[in-house]
Amino acid sequence: MTLTFGSNSKTAFLFPGQGAQVVGMGLELYERSGAAKDVFGKVDEALGRPLSKILFEGPEDELRETINAQPGIMAVSLACVGAMNENLDKDDIPDPVLMAGHSLGEYTALAAAGVLSVKDAALLVQKRGELMQEACDSNPGTMAAILGLDEMTLEEIARESGTFVSNINTEEQIVISGGKMAVARAMDMASARGAKKVIPLRVGGAFHSGLMESAKAGLIEALNNVEFVEPNVPIIANCTAQPLKSAEEIRGELIRQIASCVQWKRSVDFMIRSGVTNFLEIGPGKALAGMVKRIDRNANISNISDLESILAFSKN
């Protein structure tokens, strides 16, 4: 599910991760775009269940489950890609020089860049969600967002509290994870050291931390059963904030990523240093756009999440 590229603008495509889900997402695309409907059909067929029904109708608690939220967000993002190709002239679609996805969104980026088929991406994302849930059951944990402290301070707090730094989203928005008691200690320590805000996250476990190590073996097995094609656009890796250019690099990244910190700020910084001035977030929500704006106030940011925003984008 690759975009038909057009202009030569210095644009990066961004794909959101878990947390962007909302009941009803993708329904308008399904009803009004044949290409989007085809994406939802392929995902449902690959998973052997009517995931799209959960996306469109809920209930919210069921949609929030990792095995539904992750492939669901990916499906909506790829449906947006399909609808863009279907409804915009080639010259209206910016030619991305780089792509990146936040956590789960990295898999969406791989599909958009032609590395994975929609079917294989859906199966991998569902398997990843199952493995993460199993790891959560074996090693219960949670996460918290810390606002207003720098990375060095959070690294110190993580060492002292027995937690992990899991997402470095912006200079002052960092997520920690670990066992529930350890995260509670870290939150208290962060508050004592001057954090502007400490926010416990409603998540099912300590994602992107050492507590997810047990998920790697199953993921390696799943990745070995999938064919990877060389990307037609470099993808910025979550773990290293460097471009992935080969199938071998991509496999290694996906294995590391499940239990490692998402280096989102460094990823955006790399894209900016590479000359990117325009960022297009494709999929539900606007979380990544907000992060990019906090990283670089001068960045030009657009969002594509439904047919209305796609048609409006063509007029820009």
Residue ranges with predicted function:
Residues 35, 72, 76, 182, ...:
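Charged catalytic carboxylate motif
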Residues 310-315:
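Short, charged, surface-exposed secondary-structure boundary motifs
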Residues 103, 227, 275:
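Conserved functional loop/turn residues at catalytic and ligand-binding sites
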Residues 2-153, 278-308:
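FabD-like malonyl-/acyl-CoA
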Residues 200-203, 272, 305:
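Short glycine-rich catalytic loops that host catalytic nucleophiles or stabilize transition states
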Residues 191, 272-275:
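Non-catalytic positions within long, well-ordered alpha-helices that form the structural scaffold/packing
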Residues 19-20, 47, 113-259:
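Alpha/beta catalytic cores of group-transfer enzymes, especially the acyltransferase/condensing modules
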Residues 265-269:
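Short hydrophobic/charged patches on amphipathic alpha-helices used for structural packing
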